[in-house]
Regions:
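OB-fold/S1-family single-stranded nucleic acid-binding modules
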Residues: 87-124
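Eukaryotic short linear interaction motifs
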Residues: 42-43, 59, 70-71, 93-95, ...
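Short, surface-exposed, charged amphipathic helix/loop patches that serve as local interaction elements
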Residues: 46-56, 85-93, 98
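A short macromolecule-binding patch
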Residues: 58-64
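Short nucleic-acid-contacting surface segments enriched for D/E, G, S/T with interspersed K/R
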Residues: 26-29, 68-87
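OB-fold ssDNA-binding interfaces and closely related basic DNA-contact patches used
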Residues: 1-56
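Exposed alpha-helical structural elements
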Residues: 3, 67-68
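Positively charged, low-complexity intrinsically disordered regions
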Residues: 60, 79, 119, 123-126
């Protein structure tokens, strides 16, 4: 008779962070947010970063391709949870996202966010 072995969950609880409704990053731009975890995940659009935020019934997650956001949350020494603000920033003619300290003032970022929303969905044009 074969020996029966107990199942061992190798990623104990880590996926429960992502067992929630997913939103767009737009939902939390310019708001102080508690980020609870992140992981790189293979999707039909290639490898993307999934970032979880919020707690309890308010928890959610979003996918991002932003290099600035991925570099922060996927850093080997990153500790979760942490509080931060995601702001829209200008990089020359391009727009992107960046983490800021939770006490950072929200000034002209509203104008950047409005410009981002107007250009969202349009491809890069030469």
């Amino acid at each position: 008779m074969n020996e029966i072995v107990d199942f061992v969950d190798e990623e104990a609880g880590s996926d429960s962070l992502f067992d929630c409704e997913y939103t767009s990053v737009d939902a939390i731009i310019n708001q102080v947010t508690v980020f609870t975890g992140a992981k790189a995940q293979q999707t039909e659009n290639g490898e993307r970063c999934l970032i979880a935020y919020g707690e309890g019934y308010n928890r959610s997650a979003f996918f991002t391709d932003s290099k600035k956001l991925k570099d922060v949350v996927l850093a080997p020494n990153r500790q979760f949870p942490f509080r931060a603000i995601i702001k829209v920033v200008n990089y020359g003619t391009m727009m992107g996202f960046k983490f800021f300290a939770p006490n950072a003032p929200i000034t002209d970022d509203k104008a950047n966010f409005e410009a981002y929303k107007r250009t969202k969905g349009r491809g890069y044009r030469r």
